[in-house]
């Protein structure tokens, strides 16, 4: 269970969180451009490890107690989430999710994204990616400032996914930013 951490962040912590998020977004932008058929999951892991070092950050997946055998989760096709990077070589049309936690000056950012390798998504793949992206935006739109409850955000996300006839695996939801990966 994550540690309950309360209180305001200092201006420096806020700056470090933003910088950590910028690093994570940059790595994801680079992966969107770089991942192609013929590249392996281990190639991705090596690239991401190098970029994290370049930024002067650290890979902090999953927790300090769990020694994850890589710096990024790479879940391909039917794999659900949190898969270890392997020597699997991507093929055109693979649906791949990347999940990464970066630490920087004591702050952590945790995020994931999904893409289709070397093709424009069509059919079920397009439906999945579009619906999940729309659910993200619905969750963001549900944030109305101080006092917004996680349940309000979750309900907005769930409504979009239900309408799209997609389910939620309740034990595997959420990403975060703060002193811990899933700060509450």
Where are the language model's segments positioned?
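Active-site neighborhoods and metal-handling regions in enzymes and metal-associated proteins
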Residues: 1-184
């Amino acid at each position: 269970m994550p540690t309950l951490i309360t209180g305001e962040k200092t201006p420096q912590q806020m700056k470090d969180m933003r910088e950590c998020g910028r690093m994570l977004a940059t790595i994801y932008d680079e992966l969107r451009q770089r991942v192609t058929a013929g590249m392996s999951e281990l190639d991705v892991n090596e690239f991401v490890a190098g970029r994290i070092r370049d930024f002067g950050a650290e890979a902090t997946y999953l927790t300090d107690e769990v020694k994850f055998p890589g710096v990024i989760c790479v879940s391909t096709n039917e794999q659900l989430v949190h898969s270890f990077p392997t020597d699997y070589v991507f093929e055109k049309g693979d649906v791949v999710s990347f999940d990464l936690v970066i630490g920087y000056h004591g702050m952590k950012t945790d995020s994931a994204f999904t893409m289709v390798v070397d093709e424009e998504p069509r059919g079920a793949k397009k439906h999945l990616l579009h619906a999940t992206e729309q659910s993200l935006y619905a969750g963001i739109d549900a944030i109305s400032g101080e006092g917004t409850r996680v349940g309000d955000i979750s309900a907005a996300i769930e409504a979009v996914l239900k309408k799209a006839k997609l389910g939620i695996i309740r034990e595997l939801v959420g990403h975060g930013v703060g002193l811990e990966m899933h700060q509450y």
